[in-house]
């Protein structure tokens, strides 16, 4: 495993839409392991592939209950509203209030290629939606409620 360089705000890769992962192979598994190591080293709760310069539809989250890997994720449903401060490893030191759904239902593949669905609320829902945004070139500062 290796630490990857986290791309910072201003890097054009953070504004690009990611492509679907076509196959789960040894290179992708290595990328996932590297992303986990990088996220934990930076004290993050999530990291998306474009944040390490890879334009693939892949992100990881861990809010303290163990890591979750999302490959080619889809958002199936959202509900409710919550406003809370968000930060991002690509914008170190910056936080802003962001309104997000309080509930999300998502479908993705895990690192073994197995499809799963997850229902999440509060912090986990926020983390999933934040990382999902990265796959479409959206940053949390685009969604801030601060004027």
From Swiss-Prot:
Its cofactor is Fe(2+). The active site is at residue 131. Pfam families: Pep_deformylase. It catalyses: N-terminal N-formyl-L-methionyl-[peptide] + H2O = N-terminal L-methionyl-[peptide] + formate. GO terms for molecular function: metal ion binding; peptide deformylase activity. Its EC number is 3.5.1.88. Binds 1 Fe(2+) ion. Keywords: Hydrolase, Iron, Metal-binding, Protein biosynthesis. Fe cation binds at residues 88, 130, 134. GO terms for biological process: co-translational protein modification; translation. SUPFAM superfamilies: Peptide deformylase. It is an enzyme of class 3 (hydrolase). Removes the formyl group from the N-terminal Met of newly synthesized proteins. Requires at least a dipeptide for an efficient rate of reaction. N-terminal L-methionine is a prerequisite for activity but the enzyme has broad specificity at other positions. PANTHER family: PEPTIDE DEFORMYLASE (PTHR10458:SF22). Belongs to the polypeptide deformylase family. This is Peptide deformylase.
